[in-house]
Curated annotation (Swiss-Prot):
Assigned protein family: Belongs to the NfuA family.
Cofactor note (record): Binds 1 [4Fe-4S] cluster per subunit. The cluster is presumably bound at the interface of two monomers.
Quaternary structure annotation from Swiss-Prot or TrEMBL: Homodimer.
Top-level taxon of origin: Bacteria
GO MF annotation, one: iron ion binding
Binding site for [4Fe-4S] cluster: 149, 152
Keyword annotations from UniProtKB, A to Z: 4Fe-4S, Iron, Iron-sulfur, Metal-binding
Organism: Shewanella halifaxensis (strain HAW-EB4)
UniProt name for this protein: Fe/S biogenesis protein NfuA
GO biological process, one term: iron-sulfur cluster assembly
General function of this protein: Involved in iron-sulfur cluster biogenesis. Binds a 4Fe-4S cluster, can transfer this cluster to apoproteins, and thereby intervenes in the maturation of Fe/S proteins. Could also act as a scaffold/chaperone for damaged Fe/S proteins.
InterPro entries: Fe/S_biogenesis_protein_NfuA, FeS_biogenesis, FSCA_dom_sf, HesB-like_dom_sf, NIF_FeS_clus_asmbl_NifU_C
Cofactor dependency: [4Fe-4S] cluster
Length: 192
């Protein structure tokens, strides 16, 4: 579930050596499954361990994860990196904002996961987003653009060369195309 590099493990052991005996770490997600999700690591003294915590054993310490955070920490990695500017602990949790869906989930759930975890973060740099409206019987994903994408002069290129290409590669036997149903209104909100 959570991978902690050897350098990060050594860093945690060093930090925990200054704490009361029996103290471990807690890895958590605040507001999991939302766009505001934030991950964190804190000390976890013995009296803060909950009955529904999942405990992961590492070299010299354990990591506790609460039941609510657990599904959002799938594939999370913690590393301790050093460069010219100094050292820092990095925590990457690709599923923190949206729970990873299983391979047998419905097509719309799997497409929605890709939209939220991969496509919308890219569109967010232009203040835009898309949402899945429906999937037609013909296998066409009907999308609606929002934010800076609404009225953008590049929306057709984004749709055909970006989003449609990506979704067709990921769901080749299930999707046949992508359609935009947005009533585009160019305005101050539009990118470009």
């Amino acid at each position: 579930m959570i991978t902690i590099s050897e350098t990060a493990q050594a860093h945690f052991v060093k930090l925990l050596s200054d704490q009361p005996e029996g103290t471990h770490i807690r890895v958590f997600v605040i507001s999991p499954g939302t766009a505001q999700a934030e991950c964190g690591v804190s000390y976890c003294p013995p009296d803060a361990v909950e009955a529904d915590d999942t405990e992961f054993e590492f070299n010299g310490f354990n990591a506790m994860v609460d039941e609510k955070s657990a599904p959002f920490l799938e594939e999370a990695t913690i590393d301790f990196v050093t460069d010219q500017l100094g050292s820092q602990l990095t925590l990457k949790a690709p599923n923190a904002k949206m729970r990873k869906v299983s391979d047998d989930a419905s097509l719309s759930e799997r497409i929605e996961y890709v939209i939220q975890s991969e496509i919308n973060p890219q569109l967010a740099s232009h203040g835009g987003n898309i949402m899945l409206v429906e999937i037609t019987e013909e296998g066409i994903a009907v999308l609606q653009f929002g934010g800076g994408c609404n009225g953008c002069s590049m929306v057709d290129v984004t749709l055909k060369d970006g989003i449609e290409k990506q979704l067709l590669e990921m769901f080749p036997s299930e999707l046949t195309g992508v359609k935009d149903v947005t009533e585009h209104q160019h305005g101050e909100h539009s990118y470009q």
